[in-house]
Each structure stands twice: as structure tokens, then as C-alpha cells.
Design a protein with these regions (language model features):
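Membrane-embedded transmembrane alpha-helical bundles that form the catalytic cores
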Residues: 1-193
């Protein structure tokens, strides 16, 4: 029931206006379609709640008695943007008994800094190169036909590296931030392709 409610709410927020405007268009119903504001991170929060419910239902984790601790799991801000995806059963004990030593904090800062450097220096440079090679001046994509095959391949490879390094960097930053507050995430970005 909880998972159904979560998915219905996600559907309403993500697709409610779209569905209502299509119904209005096809039926000619003269009602005004409300603009539904999409809460930031609704998909992330929904899937966090679903993993919690599934882990508790399967008996992989016991139900959380502290609303504050459950809220912490659902809203782990540092992994909200790009992961890593973490199951409740994998970190429930750490949520209740978090301890961050000076070594953990230093290691977390180091990992976060490496991720930030990967993003700011390598991924952003690859993005600029990909844009130069693949996005024509003025946005007229018919001009791509005039580019050499080599420049297009360089653009495609730069774009591929940008995406790979972006996600790797975001994972590094999230793992580092988790370490700083006493949460050890599993490595999940060894071989994404």
C-alpha cells in the first residue's frame, strides 16, 4: 500500500498536468488545467522510501522507530543529485550509530576534493570540447554535415568522457560527504559502461 501511494504521488506530481491537459485537449472539456509544481527531488525521495519499505517487508532491515532517522535516510542530500544509490539495509546501522573520526573527516574531504576537481577540471573541459565539436554556431545543426568525421568523433568521445567523469565525480563527492558525517557508502562506480 505504501509503495502504491508513493508511486501515485510521484505520478501526480510528474505527469498530472500532462495527463489533464491531454484529457482537456481530446475531450474539449473547458476546465482550467492546474499547474502542478514538481517538488525538488521527488523521484529521489520516492525511490528512497520504496527501498526502505522493500527492505523492511523482506526482513532485510527492521522498521525504523525514529522518524528523525528515517527522515535522514530519505533525505540524504549529498547523494540526491547523482547517487550513489544506497539501499536502506546497507546503511541502517550506520544511520543510528554514526561516528566520524578525524581520519574519516580528512578522508572524506580528500575524496570530495578529488571529485570536485574531476568535475571542475576534467568533465567541464570535456564538455567544452564536445560543445565546440558538436554544437554549431547559432545552434543550426544542419551545419554538422560540413564538419569532418574526425572532429565529430572527437566531439562524441569528449561527450562520452564528460558523462562518465561527471557521474564518477558526483559519486566521489557524495561518498566523501558521507564519510565526513560517518556514513560509509559502497563503491558503485567501478565499471559503469
Amino acid at each position: 500500500l505504501t509503495i502504491s501511494v508513493d508511486l501515485v504521488l510521484l505520478g501526480i506530481f510528474k505527469y498530472g498536468s500532462f495527463i489533464l491537459s491531454n484529457i482537456k485537449f481530446f475531450t474539449g472539456f473547458p476546465a482550467k488545467v492546474p499547474s502542478i509544481m514538481l517538488p525538488i527531488g521527488i523521484s529521489f525521495y520516492t525511490f528512497q522510501l520504496i527501498t526502505y519499505c522493500v527492505d523492511v517487508y523482506r526482513g532485510d532491515a527492521r522498521p525504523q522507530r525514529s522518524f528523525k532517522t528515517l527522515l535522514l535516510y530519505v533525505s540524504l542530500f549529498h547523494q540526491c543529485i547523482a547517487g550513489p544509490i544506497v539501499r536502506y539495509k546497507d546503511i541502517c546501522a550506520e544511520l543510528e550509530e554514526r561516528r566520524a573520526s578525524q581520519f574519516d573527516i580528512a578522508e572524506g574531504i580528500n575524496r570530495f576534493t578529488v571529485g570536485l576537481a574531476k568535475k571542475a577540471i576534467i568533465a567541464n573541459t570535456c564538455a567544452a570540447l564536445a560543445d565546440t565539436m558538436l554544437v554549431p554556431d547559432g545552434g543550426d545543426f544542419s551545419l554538422l554535415a560540413s564538419k569532418s568525421v574526425l572532429s565529430l568523433w572527437v566531439g562524441v568521445l569528449a561527450f562520452t568522457l564528460q558523462i562518465y567523469i561527471d557521474f564518477s565525480a558526483y559519486s566521489d563527492m557524495a561518498i566523501g560527504m558521507g564519510k565526513m558525517i560517518g556514513i560509509n557508502y559502497t563503491e558503485n562506480f567501478d565499471y559503469p559502461y
